[in-house]
Amino acid sequence: VTDLPATLDLPTALVVLPGGKSAVADAGPARELRPPYARELIQEAPVLVAHAAMTARRLGLNAPGRSRRILDALELYAFVRPARFTAPSAAGLALALGLPEPRGVAAQAQALREVCRILLAELAATPWPSREEALVLAETLDRGGWSWGAAVIGALRSQPIKHSPRGSGLEVWSRIPEWEDQAPAGEPGSKPIDPEAAGRRLDELLQRAGLDEARASQKVFAAETAWAFQPREREGEPRMMLAEAGTGVGKTMGYLAPASLWAEANGPAVWVSTYTRALQRQIERESAGIFPDPAVRARKVVVRKGRENYLCLLNFQESVNAAQLGNGDLVGLGLTARWARASRDGDMTGGDFPAWLPSLFAVAPAVQASAGNLVDRRGECVHAGCVHYRACFIEKAVRGSKHADIVIANHALVMSQAAFDGARTARGLKGDNETTSLRRIVFDEGHHLFDAADSAFSAALSGAESAELRRWIRGPEGRGRRGRGLEARLMEIVGDREAARDALQDAIHAAAALPGEGWSGRIAPPDGQVNPLGPIEAFLVAVIEQLRARAAPGDQGLEAAARPATDLVRDTAALAAAALARVEAPLLALARHLEDLLDEETDELPTSDRARIEGALRGLDRRARMTLPGWRSMLKAIEEDAEDDPDFVDWFDATFLYGRVVDAACRRHWVDPTEPLTAAVIAPAHGILVTSATLADSTLDDPFALAEMRTGAARLPERPQTLRLQSPFDYAANTRAFVVTDVGKDDPRQVAAAMRELFLAAGGGGLGLFTAIRRLKAVHERIAAPLADKGLALYAQHVDPLEVGALVDIFRAEEDSCLLGTDAVRDGVDVPGRSLRLLVFDRMPWPRPDILHKARRQRFGGKGYDDGLARARLAQAFGRLIRRADDKGVFVMLDAAAPTRLFSGLPEGVELQRVGLVEAIEATAAFLARG
């Protein structure tokens, strides 16, 4: 590493592990430090840390504000290596720079200094013109109080500067390449795919990726799934296939082989839909086998997400302007500018944006440089009316997806887009111009289709949702708030069309009846003195009153059936429905005026104006033709105290925060969401492949019966094709599974002690899964310090100030760390190797018996339905343990009452043993020690 100038001397490095164990490193050897001295150091002295907020929290302190005293190595990494991955810890940084994993707190403190020296030396070697670009931004951030300012400027000025930099460096929108329009790609073709050619393509892909030749099961998978890419025979009857491929078969490459052949012959495009971000990233990586050239791959493989995932350059510019006037996080925005310049696609919620960046210091949530403030969550986009339209990340992704061979998306986007297109088609309009026809779809992680459809095809009238609608129509009404209402977005478009202007003003006036600023404090104040403004808030107050009268308090809030409703709920529902009708009518009128404008002036409209109108119509359609009618339908049923519709479940619930109600909602879900899923997504498609490692259920006479019901396949005229391939892994040799029979699952002390000793027996690498947040926190409180004393770091969802993806990144990077999470975490954990070698459930993951689940259990088979869901959850969790042929893992259930029949979904060769805790601990230690 290049020696640094004396002016760049680093302060003392401080690392604090979960549990409070601390160490410091300066010019001499690293040494451990007692917590009181560590607290004094971070509060008073210059100090170098990795994640200031998490470091302070482990010492029992609040997150510090920005200070020139506290240098966070993660900020330096974000500046020097923007849009490049690191786990947000000292060990994670060391691994990201190619250093060996530092084990133990003292080694991590020493490594932290070395990491910063390497990064500053790397910065000193930055070539022109990147050096000038970095320098101008660093000088701006230094004036804004950035603790790394002097060190970064010193490194950049260690070599001559060719040109004097100009500007602030924050104007990233002026340096992002613009997109270019292309001719329409046309509709996809229907040429068949040869199964043998799919096998040959698989061999090519594996060879390009530098992998071994295909396993026999992988070749079978590629050839058999080609069936879903053949031409369909009849309208409304897609070629649908359910394919279970056990872990290790290689299903991703297996379906990319026929998908890429089909796209070459017929495209665009095959849509590959996933449930988790981790799998999206994996598919994108594996697509390198199809298109080795990065430039070609960028055109041919596009990750497509909803607008609410991408950095909005206009929001960013407005935030920068505010921060330069003293109202914002200038440093955070500067680091975000560095990221945006380097980002592959501007995705802030699962792409290359460091999600840990906004949480490093105590910054008010409203001004953080976070996705919540910088993406277009509120549908406020002005489309071609935006000065950054040609550089827009969202527009770039939209256009890219129209011409790509493979579009990688998520279940939510595919379903919402299909539902929207279906609604437009039903009115005789063309589909959304943002998306190509969804002719061929691969649903990976297909076991989540039911849950994704449940979310996509539901309705919720809540304080937050209705307040968001008010803001979308009227714009921000508080002081200093950013945003754009309908008037700002549309007045220029409607021009002198008096009827359209009147409709716009009527909508703005009617929206005043929706909840406004401070609504939560009025409907559920801490002192109980409610003061609702308007009919929607009055309805929500009545809902909360009914909930308190009828609901049993639970861990996650209150819920009660919507009907029979109290007199107050019925009366306020009628008034709320009338208010919503007054909002809906002018929005519909405005939509019709805009449709007329497109029709009547089609030969005169500039392309930019057409894009603005079509964008406005998308927002109006979703709200005036989908959301508002859904809300009014729910309210009408409540007002009339109607008989329950057998296809729907209506209920009320309340949201709690810090122990008190902050919102209430009226919800409507389909009992069977595969009905709209089939109508909107599956039936219009030509070919559907649903795949997962856990689709079938061996305990059923027909192993795919439950999967057919939960994917919509059972609703098609013809049964789907099915394929089932076993995992090639040797589970009998590489796994152990225990049910512990002598731990009281309802005693937090016993559960904590059991989990602690199991984690110690494994030497770390343990994942603890809980079915309730309360129990997770209770266990964490009891075991974090004892594990830290033994050198094992314990991270926890809902405890550490990081989103779960960042926690999983740390868990993956630090081989001997442990992680606690809710049962839902199992879906996002893709951790091969020794980092995950022990998985412990606190109790059986039964489905929560809420109102919605009770209705489904009655519809779908009672106890057998519950068993099927629990069995699948166990199988999915077990599948996290073994990701490669040489992995070893232990599965432990701490619920003695767990029925043996539910473990029948575990892979062939796994033997379930019911043992006492001591025996489980000894067996875990002995088995993993052999690996």
Question: Would you name each region that the model predicts?
Answer:
Residues 11-123:
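Conserved DEDDh/DEDDy metal-dependent 3′-5′ exonuclease domain
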Residues 728-746, 799-899:
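Conserved RecA-like P-loop NTPase helicase motor core
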Residues 234-258:
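Walker A/P-loop
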Residues 371-402, 418-429, 596-741, 747-749, ...:
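A contiguous, basic/glycine-rich beta-loop/short-helix subdomain that forms a polymer-engagement track
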Residues 190-243:
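Conserved pre-motif I regulatory segment
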Residues 89-159, 891:
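Acidic, Mg2+-coordinating catalytic module of metal-dependent nucleases/exonucleases
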